[in-house]
């Protein structure tokens, strides 16, 4: 494999440099300035050696992973920036989601496990069965560790916003119930939310009424046109 060969070459090169003590043979024909530059490579050599070591370590780790040695880094352990990865949400929305995540992360380990999710759903007023909780985690569990990282928690709201969750699924219920955080929004926030819902329903009803009125008007016009045609034909027949 090319990766193994490159890693071997880098390791051998580092070993040879270590045995040689970093000495460089004097090259004939160099003038004074060039000789001075060639004789003072300490910082550059140190930086190059550090970069070589880092690259060698990465290549060796990749070779180990390809051979089934070592464990790959799980997505939940990777550092990510929620503001750049989840651009569809505002900073305030992400902050609210983070606050909710930390509220139910009782173990303070950066994850919401099965029992913590069970407690969350009970406090939201939508208790789930053991199997239901497992299915909730499974739907966004990218690294298959049977618990939710903050990134996976954000995926719930991304899927909900995109309409990718079934209406009766536990994750959809979680996203819907967490729209109103009574502890921060208070009764006023809940009131304004439901008023907005009622207003949206009223607007929808008015829209439906307008459509029905237009349909009735078209029917009336069609009936009048039909009657005029019949009258015209009757008038024509009298002149034959």
From Swiss-Prot:
Tissue expression pattern: Found in lymphocytes; preferentially expressed in CD8+ cells.
InterPro entries on file: AIF-1_EF_pair, EF-hand-dom_pair, EF_hand_dom, EFHD1/2
Annotated SUPFAM superfamilies: EF-hand (SSF47473)
PROSITE patterns: EF_HAND_2 (PS50222)
Segments forming domain EF-hand: 92-127, 128-163
Residues annotated to bind Ca(2+) 1: 105, 109, 116
Biological role: May regulate B-cell receptor (BCR)-induced immature and primary B-cell apoptosis. Plays a role as negative regulator of the canonical NF-kappa-B-activating branch. Controls spontaneous apoptosis through the regulation of BCL2L1 abundance.
Alphabetized UniProt keyword annotations: Acetylation, Calcium, Membrane, Metal-binding, Phosphoprotein, Repeat
Protein name per Swiss-Prot or TrEMBL: EF-hand domain-containing protein D2
GO cellular component: membrane raft
Positions carrying Phosphoserine: 11, 74, 76
Subcellular location: Membrane raft
Residue numbers of Phosphotyrosine PTMs: 83
Main location: membrane
Claim: Repeat is one of the keywords in the record: yes
Start and end residues of each stretch annotated as Disordered: 13-38
Record PTM N6-acetyllysine, positions in chain: 233
PTM sites of type N-acetylalanine: 2
GO molecular function, one term: calcium ion binding
Record's subunit section: Interacts with CASP9; with inactive form.
SMART domains in alphabetical order: EFh
PANTHER family assigned: EF-HAND DOMAIN-CONTAINING PROTEIN D, EF-HAND DOMAIN-CONTAINING PROTEIN D2
Species, as recorded: Homo sapiens (Human)
